């Protein structure tokens, strides 16, 4: 038998903060040949958090939808949102407009980060939701100036994977980080029982339902898996 301390961390952010301090120069994530360290992730997610808190004036408990595949922008946005005490609503990038409408209305999300490839679907239903703020990211936004520009050009103009869309007043992901850099970061107080995620089911027995996952839920699962792997 092995005893584990499920109260070791107050929140999911505490867990990440430990990683940021212990392994600053280690690679945290890698995508399409580009990697970011834990130090990079720490700094970038603070900028994203600052933007949500100071520019959008989002409050603890507000919902942010993230509709993105596995690109480097995703962990930056996810951790940044959690640092602001915001509830993350992960959204399947392959959702139809009808499925998006249901999830966004049901969750009550006020803001969304969406990859430009799917923004045309958001345009169709955004007026029926509570979404006030839209952040649009391009596939190559975190790949560096040269490679990122090339990837974005190929995706949009060669492969034609970004249908035209109109979302007046949206923020670009790069602009979000620039605006967030203006502020000094301050961690929002998050308790173990605060909701971290609204994770929606597959909807195999009806409409998709949002499962409330607290910081304690997620941290406990991480500790359990880590203990089992040891």
Model-derived segments and spans:
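Adenylate-forming
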Residues: 19, 29, 41, 45-48, ...
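Conserved AMP-binding A3 loop
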Residues: 37-39, 196-223
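Conserved structural elements of the adenylate-forming
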Residues: 42-48, 178-183, 211-230
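Conserved pre-ATP/AMP-binding loop-to-beta segment of ANL
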Residues: 164-200, 207, 230
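Structural core segment of the AMP-binding/adenylate-forming
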Residues: 83-175
């Amino acid at each position: 038998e092995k005893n584990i301390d499920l109260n070791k961390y107050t929140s999911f952010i505490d867990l990440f903060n430990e990683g940021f301090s212990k392994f600053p120069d280690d690679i945290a994530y890698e995508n399409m040949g580009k990697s970011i360290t834990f130090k990079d992730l720490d700094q970038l997610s603070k900028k994203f958090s600052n933007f949500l808190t100071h520019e959008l004036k989002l409050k603890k408990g507000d919902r942010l939808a993230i509709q993105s595949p596995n690109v480097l922008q995703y962990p930056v946005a996810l951790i940044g949102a959690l640092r602001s005490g915001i509830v993350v609503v992960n959204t399947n990038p392959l959702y139809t407009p009808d499925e998006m409408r249901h999830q966004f209305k049901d969750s009550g999300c006020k803001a969304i980060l969406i990859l430009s490839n799917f923004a045309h679907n958001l345009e169709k239903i955004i007026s029926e939701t509570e979404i006030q703020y839209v952040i649009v990211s391009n596939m190559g936004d975190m790949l560096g100036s040269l490679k990122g520009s090339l990837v974005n050009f190929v995706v949009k103009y060669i492969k034609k994977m970004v249908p035209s869309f109109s979302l007046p007043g949206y923020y670009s992901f790069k602009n979000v980080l620039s605006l967030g850099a203006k502020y000094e970061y301050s961690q929002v107080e998050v308790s173990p029982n605060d909701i971290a995620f609204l994770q929606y089911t597959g909807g195999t027995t009806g409409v998709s339902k949002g499962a409330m996952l607290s910081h304690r839920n997620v941290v406990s699962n991480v500790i359990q898996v880590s203990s089992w792997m040891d």
